[in-house]
Amino acid sequence: MKALSKQESRAGIWMVDTEVPRPGPNDLLIRVKKGSICGTDVHIYKWDEWAQKTIPVPMVVGHEYVGVVAAMGSEVRGFNVGDRVSGEGHVTCGHCRNCRAGRRHLCRNTLGVGVNRPGSFAEYLVLPAFNAFKLPDDIPDDVAAIFDPFGNAVHTALSFDLVGEDVLVTGAGPIGVMAAAVARHVGARNVVITDINDYRLDLARKMGVTRAVNVTKEDLWSVARNELGMTEGFDVGLEMSGSGPAFAQMVDVMNNGGKIALLGIPSGDVRIDWNAVIFKMLTIKGIYGREMFETWYKMAALIQSGLDLRPIITHHFGIDDFQQGFDAMLSGQSGKVILDWEKR
């Protein structure tokens, strides 16, 4: 089969021929239809410090996809050949304290599809059946292909009550924009998103945010106070950028008793005003991945109740043009980029 693999310890991704993997007794063999390029894949492509420490070479990469069940292990129940599926990319151990307590998203022994085990940028993927999510018929393939990052957005956005609240999202990458759209969909009063990339702020506007702010050109607090009538600060903060200055600004503009969910990963140490955290009595919660599988059920329900993610998908390429897809991601002038394994 064809696959995209990190073949060498340098920048780049390579198309290779490799054997079709064999499912174990508890696994599904999934024929991949479409995949999406994640920021993690870009880190691996660029071979940055994190990738060098984390990724064994060679490794088939990718973890955002939609496909159909091609074969099943002998012990698999609840699936049929031909079922349309996506899947949870965090493969957990099942025997640690958190797994046994039903908190699998907190497993200390998690392996990542396309990171520590073979990924979904391939014609076929083997995945534990436990990790597969059977897709409703009314969720289109393009949207299903981005369910993994959508799950990050949903997990982050729904960490706190949003109904009637003023929400600040820092970072207008695809996950940040989707988190902002979730907040609007479930009833937040104002949803403000900040970034320094005008292209992605325009995507956020298309997804329905109340206000998109380029912090190099406008003052965030002036916009909130003078345009939106906010006098006390934001109630909920969703930090999606990994930017130290963005996080510091978020802490500064939160209302007393505000709640912050952190998904963005900083590249180094970040300084914030801990006195503000204490005296404002802020709650800060770290987010990683998706809750298994509560987040997945909520994702499907949000789409089925009318949340439209299609504007965040900006590019489509046949798999033979994968390099163009990575170039689009690297440019910063894209939303989600779809690679189609059925289009050569």
Curated annotation (Swiss-Prot):
Zn(2+) 2 binds at C93, C96, C99, C107. The active site is at T40 (charge relay system), H43 (charge relay system). It is found in: Cytoplasm. The keyword Cell membrane does not apply. SMART domains: PKS_ER. Pfam families: ADH_N, ADH_zinc_N. Its EC number is 1.1.1.103. NAD(+) binds at I175, D195, R200, L263, G264, I265, I287, Y288. Its main location: cytoplasm. The keyword Disulfide bond does not apply. Pathway: Amino-acid degradation; L-threonine degradation via oxydo-reductase pathway; glycine from L-threonine: step 1/2. Homotetramer. This is L-threonine 3-dehydrogenase. It comes from Deinococcus deserti (strain DSM 17065 / CIP 109153 / LMG 22923 / VCD115). The lineage of its organism: Bacteria, Thermotogati, Deinococcota, Deinococci, Deinococcales. The gene is tdh.
